[in-house]
UniProtKB/Swiss-Prot annotation:
Pfam families in the cross-refs: EFG_C (PF00679), EFG_III (PF14492), EFG_IV (PF03764), GTP_EFTU (PF00009), GTP_EFTU_D2 (PF03144)
tr-type G domain boundaries: 40-317
Keywords: Elongation factor, GTP-binding, Mitochondrion, Nucleotide-binding, Protein biosynthesis
Keyword match Secreted: no
Record organism: Drosophila melanogaster
Miscellaneous comment: This protein may be expected to contain an N-terminal transit peptide but none has been predicted.
Gene3D superfamilies: 3.30.230.10, 3.30.70.240, Elongation Factor G (Translational Gtpase), domain 3 (3.30.70.870), P-loop containing nucleotide triphosphate hydrolases (3.40.50.300), Translation factors (2.40.30.10)
Recorded phenotype for the gene knockout or disruption: Larvae are able to survive on maternal contribution until the third larval stage but they fail to initiate the rapid growth phase and die.
GO biological process: mitochondrial translational elongation
Gene: mEFG1
Binding site for GTP: 49-56, 116-120, 170-173
Function (record text): Mitochondrial GTPase that catalyzes the GTP-dependent ribosomal translocation step during translation elongation. During this step, the ribosome changes from the pre-translocational (PRE) to the post-translocational (POST) state as the newly formed A-site-bound peptidyl-tRNA and P-site-bound deacylated tRNA move to the P and E sites, respectively. Catalyzes the coordinated movement of the two tRNA molecules, the mRNA and conformational changes in the ribosome.
Protein name (database record): Elongation factor G, mitochondrial
Coiled-coil portions: none
Length: 745
């Protein structure tokens, strides 16, 4: 048996031996023979879930069983090696995944590109980017925790990018695991048409194997690390349940799939292939979610999950990817990109992640159309800059393997390309083609930051420049009012991790100030303006008059700013309208009540006046400044604050204390549920009231409670909160005397 044959057909022990022999034979890795598969033999998948559901451990097992790594390490293992996919030192220390690591592997002659994504809410943008470029995903759920807040976030993101998914209920070996409850939560909370395609043979410490409902066989994982798979008859005590669950699976599938539905109604017999074909069709259409079970830590259920990835998730040719051709004054024209791996069409790729590596900036891309070879020239669609490809690499966590060419469907990386995440690259700069950009949420928390030593300022600047380029949710700016340098992001943990990375990677220890909330200011009702800007001081003067109305946008758009030109005729010449918009957007950076940005406002320019000599774009910009100051005085304003979705889980005996604390923090409780001595409460709480909650929860639940929160929306503040914010702002500006309250004896 040749080495290559042994690799493609042999079991994993043979495969590992073959890999070692190939290494001696001078191959860099199995990149050389997994490089160019036909499109049917490629899968681009992501592994997404709530924090601590076991994503990274599952990826580690997948890499081991597919022969990609020779030994396994745990996320917080005793050997201190850490998981392969957690390449950053900070990730291994904390046992969480911060960046989404990319790798690829081979299973049954199919090339699988895997992106392991973070589960912590503060790193949502990493998940967004990963899902944008994937064709399918594995949603990992904890058999104890079930559907948690971040699971719902990931589910929403999958819906946004239309990503088909398999569900894998992990951690069957944990005390209190209940996969049946998790399935009912998937149906009720996530609205998934879901059913088991596998059942566990025992749970907790009694977890022996799984039942495959499609093949009607029991699967046992034996030998060292569960590498030997033994098929057997379904245990006697599980046959009735297996038949019932198989019938339930067929009913759910028949509701979602026409072909199987007809067979079901005509009461014709089903074959295993009929069910598999229906599962594939419905999974790709997102009308059904197959649910698999297992425990990655105890090496059970991982190989059948890999088989399901090949059987039910789409290849790049089965997913429609659209490009948009921009045309002036028209809606962009949609173009379906050709996924064929033949290089006939021009190359189109999307940069979905940036990383500063040892050799300069590393840019992760997904190729959607055509072929890219070493030495080719490509153009950035946003900047029109030309880039020559000196080196193409494929990634295995933080190790690189050089390749000569990549085709549609491949995930790869380039060096030294100056771009931002979400940029489109093409070989033809004239076609104005771009992919839809990646959705980036607005930051909600800001903190003052300063280096501890003045000599570290250079390193501090380098770190800030790198991190803001890599992560679009991490912002950096200087506040002139308080003369402080501020960073803003998706949460306290997000900013703390960057502070620690500055110290570790750049030798620049920094001090973070207290967290500050990103409030917004908006109008309560419409306010008209008619403003004349006139300045004459010898020579040509300035003259501009604008008339219109500023009005609030609907609540679901209260983070946006809109500008509408409703002028008719030439009272306001069209070349001066951009000046009005520029003036409006400049003034929107700082409100009157609390100095925060304006949002949720539409500026309607309806009429005005100009002077044949004295009018200019600058004059109209200054007129917009004056008009908005007029609206500040005459309009009715309110402050908006970010509201967070909070999920708290704790033992039942602390339910009263937890609910009381949330109510005290102005929380609105939206739901509760209890199970086996534990309860979960869902609430909407203003972010401003959530600081310090972690410590309070720990002390009130004897350290047993835990909570997660994620941004939901902006909503008006309570009147007393607004008064307090306005007063604090006025005091900081020296506009009001601080309250001198009498001290109580």
């Amino acid at each position: 048996m040749s080495l290559i044959t042994r690799l493609l057909t042999g079991n994993n022990t043979l495969r590992l031996r073959a890999l070692k022999s190939l290494g001696k034979a001078g191959y860099s890795s199995h990149a050389k023979f997994s490089e160019h598969k036909p499109i049917e033999r490629i899968r681009n998948i992501g592994i997404s879930a709530h924090i601590d559901s076991g994503k990274t451990t599952l990826t580690e097992r997948i890499l081991f069983y597919t022969g990609r790594i020779a030994e396994m390490h745990e996320v917080r293992g005793k050997d201190n090696v850490g998981a392969t996919m957690d390449s950053m030192e900070l990730e291994r220390q904390r046992g969480i995944t911060i960046q989404s690591a990319a790798t690829y592997t081979l299973w049954k002659d199919t090339n699988i590109n895997i992106i392991d994504t973070p589960g912590h809410v503060d790193f949502t943008v990493e998940v967004e980017r990963a899902l944008r470029v994937l064709d399918g995903a594995v949603l990992v759920l904890c058999a104890v925790g079930g559907v948690q807040s971040q699971t719902l976030t990931v589910n929403r993101q999958m819906k946004r990018y239309n990503v088909p998914c398999l569900a894998f209920i992990n951690k069957l070996d944990r005390l209190g695991s209940n996969p049946y409850r998790v399935l009912s939560q998937m149906r009720s909370k996530m609205n998934h048409n879901a059913a088991f395609i596998q059942l566990p043979i025992g749970v907790e410490s009694n977890c022996k194997g799984i039942v495959d409902l499609v093949r009607e066989k029991a699967i046992y994982f034996e030998g060292e690390h569960g590498m030997d798979i033994r098929l057997d008859e379904i245990p006697q005590d599980m046959r009735v349940e297996s038949l019932e669950r198989r019938q339930e699976l067929i009913e759910h599938l028949s509701n979602a799939d026409e072909t199987l539905g007809e067979l079901f109604l005509e009461e014709k017999p089903f074959t295993e292939d009929d069910i598999k074909a229906a599962l594939r069709r419905t999974c790709i259409n997102r009308t059904f979610t197959p649910v698999l079970v297992g425990t990655a830590l105890k090496n059970k259920g991982v190989q059948p999950l890999l088989d399901a990835v090949l059987d039910y998730l789409p290849n790049p040719g089965e997913v429609e990817n659209l490009g948009f051709i921009e045309k002036e004054g028209q809606d962009p024209e949609k173009v379906v990109l050709n996924p064929a791996r033949d290089g006939k069409d021009p190359f189109v790729g999307l940069a979905f992640k940036l990383e500063a590596g040892r050799f300069g900036q590393l840019t992760y891309l997904r190729c959607y159309q055509g072929v890219l070879r070493k030495g080719d020239n490509i153009f950035n669609a946003r900047t029109n800059k030309k880039v020559r490809i000196a080196r193409l690499v494929r990634l295995h966590s933080n190790q690189m393997e050089d390749v000569n060419e990549v085709y549609a469907g491949d995930i790869f990386a380039l060096f030294g390309v100056d771009c931002a995440s979400g940029d489109t690259f093409t070989t033809n700069p004239k076609n104005n083609l771009s992919m839809e950009s990646i959705f980036v949420p607005e930051p909600v928390v800001s903190m003052a930051i300063k280096p501890n030593n003045t000599k570290d300022r250079d390193n501090f600047s380098k770190a800030i420049a790198r991190f803001t380029k890599e992560d679009p949710t991490f912002h950096f700016f200087f506040d002139n009012d308080v003369k402080e340098t501020l960073v803003s992001g998706m949460g306290e943990l997000h900013l703390e991790i960057y502070a620690q990375r500055m110290e570790r990677e750049y030798g620049c220890p920094v001090t973070l100030g207290k967290p500050k909330v990103a409030f917004r200011e908006t109008l309560v009702g419409p306010c008209e303006f008619d403003y004349l800007h006139k300045k004459q001081s010898g020579g040509s003067g300035q003259y501009a008059r604008i008339i219109g109305v500023m009005e609030p946008l609907p609540p679901n758009q209260n983070t946006l700013l809109e500008f509408v030109d409703e002028t008719v005729g030439t009272n306001v010449p069209k070349q001066f309208v951009p000046g009005v918009e520029k003036g409006y957007r400049e003034m929107a950076e700082k409100g009157m009540l609390s100095g925060h940005k304006l949002s949720g406002i539409r500026f309607r320019l309806q009429d005005g006046g100009h002077h044949i000599v004295d009018s200019s774009e600058l004059a109209f910009m200054l007129a917009a400044h004056g008009a908005i100051k007029e609206v500040f005085q005459n309009g009715s304003w309110q402050i908006l604050e970010p509201i967070m979705l909070v999920e708290v889980t704790a033992p039942e005996e602390f339910q009263g204390a937890v609910m009381g604390h949330l109510s005290k923090r102005h929380g609105i409780i939206t739901g509760t549920e209890g199970t086996e001595g534990w309860f979960t409460v869902y609430a909407e709480v203003p972010l401003n009231d959530m600081f310090g909650y972690a410590g309070e929860l720990r002390s009130s639940t004897q350290g047993k409670g835990e909570f997660t929160m994620e941004y939901s929306r902006y909503s008006p503040c309570l009147p007393d909160v607004q008064d307090q914010i306005v007063r604090q702002y006025q005091e900081s500006q020296g506009l009001a005397q601080p309250d001198k309250k009498k001290k109580k004896n």
